[in-house]
Amino acid sequence: MRISGVTLFRVSSQLRNVVNGQWTTTHYTVKDRSTDPRWKDVDLARESDVYDVVIVGGGPSGLSAAIRLRQLAEKAQKELRVCVVEKASVIGGHTLSGAVIETRALDELIPNWKELGAPVYQQVTSESIAILTESGRIPVPVLPGVPLANHGNYIVRLGKVVQWLGEQAEAAGVEVWPEIAASEVLYNEDGSVKGIATSDVGIGKDGAPKDGFARGMEFHAKCTIFAEGCRGHLSKQVLDKFDLRTHAMTYGIGLKELWEIDPAKHRPGYVEHTMGWPLNVDQYGGSFLYHIEDQGQPLVSVGFVVALDYANPNLNPYKEFQKYKTHPSISKQLEGGKRIGYGARALNEGGFQSIPKLHFPGGCLVGCSAGFLNVAKLKGTHNAMKSGMVAAESIFEDIQQKGEDVQTIDPATYDKNIRDTYVVKELKATRNIRPSFNTSLGYIGGLIYSGIFYVFGRGIEPWTLGHGKKDNEKLIPVKDAKEIDYPKPDGKLTFDLLTSVSLTGTNHTEDQPAHLTLKNDQVPLDVNLAVYGGPEARFCPAGVYEFVPSEADESKKRLQINAQNCIHCKTCDIKDPQQNINWVTPEGGGGPKYEGM
């Protein structure tokens, strides 16, 4: 009998929740290691290393910061030790984006990027914007200067660009460490950030040390740059500790597939964005579809973004994406093709209003850890890179002024300097587009507002709209919500969830403490399921959360957490109604293995 890889994935996803014959949901009882007899004879001392700058996260912002630091050091003929730690098994392995990029930051950072062979070669040749109805399509003119106009931009596979940036960083003298998960922020006695510690390895799911236990390592630095991306685990901690955020962030979830399509249907350089169907008029979101030729392959990046401030707990972002692909204008481009990739990632949609204070004693936030995505443009790579570069310049200036013996850098000029760049200026100009869709006029009101105040005024209005309540506070009880009917997948154009997850390559060491932790085990049943119908089973794009019959009483439910499936999108950490789910760092190397996503 032949067993498919997807079948094995389904079975193993269930069995991984059995420990010593007992079903587990999420976490073991945390015990103080000093009083836990299982740890009595274990050496818990950590080795440490000292750098000038430690960067957490090997994405566009972190790598740009690293490269810029080394460029400045070389120009000044100064020794400067810089390292990047990245939790993915390879640089670019956790990167997922559309992506159409502006090259302005890349032009500045590495002017000869074309000669160096950067995987940035598919220029936008044509584009369209439309509002979809269930079977129709209403074209929207692409006026020069509107946020979604893409003349002069490039379609890329961002994971490949990030991999290339990693190579440039190493060539510049940066120490780049993939498969290293930063799990803890270290502090000096005065409360300033001292650096980070990496995760321990070799701990069983029950919290006991295994034979191969190895203590994590400490990385100390004058300044630590947090470049973890949207809703970073450590970034979230420093935001709270230093009280950096004044206004709440609002988020979206972006889901993406990569297709190899019929060459006869391929239009290299074509970019398409849509709004409307299948989402309701009171729901913010939309789609992207990009034709890119990559080494002769006729590829299409197709994706769907759903704002996470939605109210209906029955909404399923993954199924909305699958439904979108059945639209006649979309399906005709994909039919006859083969899907070769899938993934999802939360993204920042707060914009200008939600930018936090960016610096603090011993560190700073860059890229999507700070929230520099321009949701009106559906672009953030250029802003992420530029923020990393500006942070690097501020840090290097401080080291130069205060001397190499300085212990802690608080790069205060970074906050001011970034606000003088195009990064914050373009976010300010588009600041009211996203929240305008949350007015009483809904979707139509947002379109009208954007047309009047941005297209003709470029954001000059003297007011700034707010985002209102946090995303997790906006769900309504399931008894008050409209049911949503989703068609069954056909296995050709639309797919079931676990088949999709199998394309992510996601994997975690099975016998390790689950990284999806619950503050209270009863909240999923007493609140999430009882009041909201169990929304975590729908908003997760990887099938991590399931409500299944309890073994003790089949008339009752229990929450099963398939942590092995997790693709590190962070949606659960954002949308869980009671903020009861806390995403923590698993062992390094775990998670998805995206290839050029």
From Swiss-Prot:
One CC-aspect GO term: mitochondrial inner membrane
GO biological process: electron transport chain
Binding site for FAD: 53-67
EC numbers for this chain: 1.5.5.1
Binding positions for a ubiquinone per the UniProt entry: G285, G286
Cross-referenced InterPro entries: 4Fe4S_Fe-S-bd, ETF-QO, ETF-QO/FixC_UQ-bd, ETF-QO/FixX_C, FAD/NAD-bd_sf
Keyword annotations from UniProtKB, A to Z: 4Fe-4S, Electron transport, FAD, Flavoprotein, Iron, Iron-sulfur, Membrane, Metal-binding, Mitochondrion, Mitochondrion inner membrane, Oxidoreductase, Transit peptide, Transport, Ubiquinone
Any Pfam family: Fer4_ETF_QO
Gene Ontology MF term list: 4 iron, 4 sulfur cluster binding; electron-transferring-flavoprotein dehydrogenase activity; metal ion binding
Function noted in UniProt: Accepts electrons from ETF and reduces ubiquinone.
Identification of the protein by name: Electron transfer flavoprotein-ubiquinone oxidoreductase, mitochondrial
Lineage: Eukaryota, Metazoa, Ecdysozoa, Nematoda, Chromadorea
